[in-house]
Amino acid sequence: MITPLDAHGNIDYNATNILIKYLEGINVDYLFPMGSTGVFPYFTLKERKDFLKFVRENSKKPIMAGVGSSSINEVNELMKFSMDIGIEAAVLMPPYYIKLNQEAIYHYYKEILSSNDMDLLIYNIPQFTNKIDPETVKNLKSEFSSVKGVKDSSADIRGFMEMLSLSDDDFAVFQGQDDLLFTSLELGASGGVCGTTNFSDGIVRLYHEYKNNREMALKIEKNDVIPLMKKLGKYQFPNAYYEYFYKKNNINGGYRPPMYRVGIEI
């Protein structure tokens, strides 16, 4: 989910409700607030909690809460809060800013998992954070039953295939790059956690068609998903995602610096 903003850069809860109803209408399986597209680092802990609470109170869909932070104390606080309000799972990427080796990343997750019983999806997005290797994921998976899967947004298909080798009935592997979802499903991925669902149902249609009509799914990727991703990719992430949502819904939305309007045509 994006985090809709008003003209002053504050969270717009009316627009958020529009987004929730849209996502429910296209039949996504989960809502994922406060992730990368939701620009979670731009918000205070209180803002993040308030947004998570609003989403929980206004949707009966299962929710995966973004709890990312380099501060373990902040992660623990967000996970406890999320559990207390009835959110089903958390999504957590490795720490960012300071370069860490795999041992440090393992201990980061171990500290958090030892303090929380909440189901967790590990989030590999090395464009923005430290990279977590499949072997580290494997070690955490074997030690903690609450590790239920991984979202991989690395765009590294070989690395993704290594993640896929970990999948089983209790461990799901999701693709985070919209234009790689079809290929990932071919390789055995559980599904996708994809940003264009904020304003387009292409990914959802692709996923459901794939089960019954592979050729139709491939056509959706070629005609809908890839052109949209190429258009969005011309602009600073994730500004165009916000503007696309605002324009599609006739919302006078805003941006929180360093975000800005990019002028995308829809």
Curated annotation (Swiss-Prot):
- UniProt-annotated site: Proton shuttle, residues: Y123
**One Gene Ontology term of the molecular function aspect:** 2-dehydro-3-deoxy-D-gluconate aldolase activity
- Report the EC code(s) recorded for this entry: 4.1.2.14, 4.1.2.51, 4.1.2.-, 4.1.2.21
* Residue numbers annotated as active site: K151 (schiff-base intermediate with substrate)
Provide the catalytic activity annotation: 2-dehydro-3-deoxy-6-phospho-D-gluconate = D-glyceraldehyde 3-phosphate + pyruvate; 2-dehydro-3-deoxy-D-gluconate = D-glyceraldehyde + pyruvate; 2-dehydro-3-deoxy-6-phospho-D-galactonate = D-glyceraldehyde 3-phosphate + pyruvate; 2-dehydro-3-deoxy-D-galactonate = D-glyceraldehyde + pyruvate
- Supply the alphabetized keyword list: Carbohydrate metabolism, Lyase, Schiff base
Temperature remarks: Optimum temperature is 65 degrees Celsius. It shows high thermostability. At 70 degrees Celsius, the enzyme does not lose activity upon incubation for 2 hours. The half-lives of the enzyme at 80 degrees Celsius and 90 degrees Celsius are 20 minutes and 15 minutes, respectively.
Any single biological process term in GO: glucose catabolic process
- Specify the superkingdom: Archaea
Tell me the pathway.
Answer: Carbohydrate acid metabolism; 2-dehydro-3-deoxy-D-gluconate degradation; D-glyceraldehyde 3-phosphate and pyruvate from 2-dehydro-3-deoxy-D-gluconate: step 2/2
pH-related activity note: Optimum pH is 5.5, and 50% of activity is found at pH 4.5 and 7.5.
Q: How does it assemble?
A: Homotetramer; dimer of dimers.
Q: What protein family is recorded?
A: Belongs to the DapA family. KDPG aldolase subfamily.
What's this protein's name? 2-dehydro-3-deoxy-D-gluconate/2-dehydro-3-deoxy-phosphogluconate aldolase
